[in-house]
């Protein structure tokens, strides 16, 4: 009992994440499984100009990270960047944001654990999906419960697998172009990109639709904004991690996409097959499909690991700021002897674990798919709120003149918000996303009104 009180009073997490951990996690945060599996689909939408879509979207995500980075630099003790919404926009919007963000990340975790089972069944099709999900969730849950430095180490190696796979793709592309490698599609050459180039080869609407697909490939880029309070020397580490985001986007996304389109003319690419598998098979790697399956499996495991970390910290924050009977009963506002929010992590993991059983219930699984799609739109609302909070921060007494400042914030901040609104609007233009967009709009309005009412003066 005394030990428990001690940990509750201490309320400080261990700074166990090093510069090495954070820098590599920042890279991993910009690279999702979509690059490995969905690049063919995104390229088929708008051809070589997809690189421009990635650069534009990545640029705005970088600006958002500069806003988050500026506020975290001023106050690196915060467990989450969501706290700045509470501080500068009020308890109502803070309540809306922290609950919405926590639930959205939980649904991302559910989607990732479902994907993990699918990737494992590539090798072991007879293994039951629910068992695979429970095993992975248990293992990664334990990783999060032991110590934050163990979490950081596991994330480091998960990220390295993705990085090596992309470097291998870029190196393969350079080799094939320089040697004029012959494939069933012709010679590998940069001409495959420039030949009959058109900015909108499939029409302007497909170019616009590409933005939403690319935007969601960048989800969780803000993850390093949750690790600051557990990072050693955050005022040195955080600016470096944020500053290098544009270079990572250009190199990893731009390099990989250009390599793919140099080897295979973009009109010949399959929208459903992984171009990574296709390219590696062209150079004689017979087990390319198994290799890329391993890469996306570790990528999904990395995302699940990060969601357990993030949901645990956010539920811990909720338990501190807006405790209810349930959160008090499970003592979600306490830290373990390893200085991690053990009970909050376990509660989040249990909720994510429901995915293992939801997916076998047809009616429920359809509703789950709609809710998951809706959470994507809610993410955009939170991104907009953090940009508004940044504007308020700049006018507050907390503003740190010699801090890590967002450049030209007076016009770049509103421009970033307009971009997020544009992406949200595109969700209503496509049949596959319109139901999720409506669901997210209903949540934003209904829960937003409730949150403001709950904390009305």
Name what the model sees in each region.
Residues 8-13, 51, 125-128, 160-293, ...:
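Helix-loop-helix junctions that connect adjacent transmembrane segments
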Residues 14, 37-136, 245-250, 254, ...:
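Extracellular loop-to-transmembrane helix junctions
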Residues 1-6, 83-86, 112-133, 165, ...:
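Helix-loop-helix connectors at the membrane interface of multi-pass transporters/channels
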Residues 117, 130-188, 215-219, 242-247, ...:
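Membrane-interface loop-to-helix entry segments
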Residues 83-86, 90, 122, 241-305, ...:
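TM-loop-TM module centered on a large, flexible mid-protein loop between adjacent transmembrane helices
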Residues 77, 100-114, 218, 222-231, ...:
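Membrane-helix boundary/coupling elements in multi-pass transport proteins
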């Amino acid at each position: 009992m005394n030990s428990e009180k001690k940990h509750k009073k201490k309320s400080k997490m261990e700074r166990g994440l090093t510069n090495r951990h954070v820098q590599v996690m920042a890279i991993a945060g910009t690279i999702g499984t979509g690059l490995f599996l969905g690049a063919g689909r995104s390229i088929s939408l708008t051809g070589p100009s997809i690189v421009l879509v990635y650069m534009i979207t990545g640029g705005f995500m970088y600006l958002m990270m500069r806003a988050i980075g500026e506020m975290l630099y001023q106050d690196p003790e915060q467990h989450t960047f969501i706290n700045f919404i509470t501080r500068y926009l009020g308890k109502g919007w803070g309540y809306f944001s922290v609950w919405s963000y926590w639930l959205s990340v939980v649904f991302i975790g559910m989607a990732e654990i479902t994907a993990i089972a699918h990737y494992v069944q590539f090798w072991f099709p007879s293994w039951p999906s629910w068992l695979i999900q429970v095993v992975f969730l248990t293992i990664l849950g334990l990783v999060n419960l032991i110590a934050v430095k163990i979490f950081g180490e596991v994330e480091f190696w998960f990220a390295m697998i993705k990085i090596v796979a992309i470097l291998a793709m870029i190196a393969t592309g350079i080799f094939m172009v320089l040697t004029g490698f012959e494939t069933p599609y012709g010679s590998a050459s940069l001409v495959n990109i420039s030949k009959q180039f058109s900015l909108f080869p499939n029409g302007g609407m497909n170019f616009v639709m590409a933005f939403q697909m690319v935007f969601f490939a960048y989800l969780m880029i803000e993850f390093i904004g949750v690790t600051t309070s557990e990072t050693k020397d955050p005022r040195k580490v955080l600016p470096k991690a944020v500053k290098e985001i544009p270079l990572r986007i250009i190199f990893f996304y731009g390099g990989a996409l250009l390599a793919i389109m140099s080897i295979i003319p973009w009109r010949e690419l399959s929208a459903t097959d992984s171009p990574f598998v296709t390219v590696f098979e062209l150079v004689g790697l017979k087990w390319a499909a198994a290799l890329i399956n391993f890469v996306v499996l570790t990528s999904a495991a990395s995302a699940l690991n990060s969601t357990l970390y993030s949901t645990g910290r956010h539920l811990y924050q909720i338990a501190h700021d807006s405790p209810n009977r349930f959160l008090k009963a499970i003592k979600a506002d306490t830290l373990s002897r390893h200085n991690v929010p053990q009970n909050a992590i376990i509660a989040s993991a249990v909720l994510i674990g429901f995915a293992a059983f939801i997916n076998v219930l047809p009616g429920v699984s359809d509703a789950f798919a709609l809710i998951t799609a809706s959470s994507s739109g809610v993410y955009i609302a939170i991104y907009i709120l953090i940009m508004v909070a940044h504007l308020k921060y700049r006018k507050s007494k907390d503003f740190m003149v010699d801090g890590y400042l967002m450049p030209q914030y007076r016009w770049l901040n509103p421009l970033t918000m307009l971009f997020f609104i544009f992406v949200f609007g595109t969700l209503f233009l496509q049949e596959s996303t319109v139901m999720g967009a409506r669901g997210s709009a209903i949540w934003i309005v209904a829960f937003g009104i409730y949150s403001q009412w709950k904390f009305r003066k």
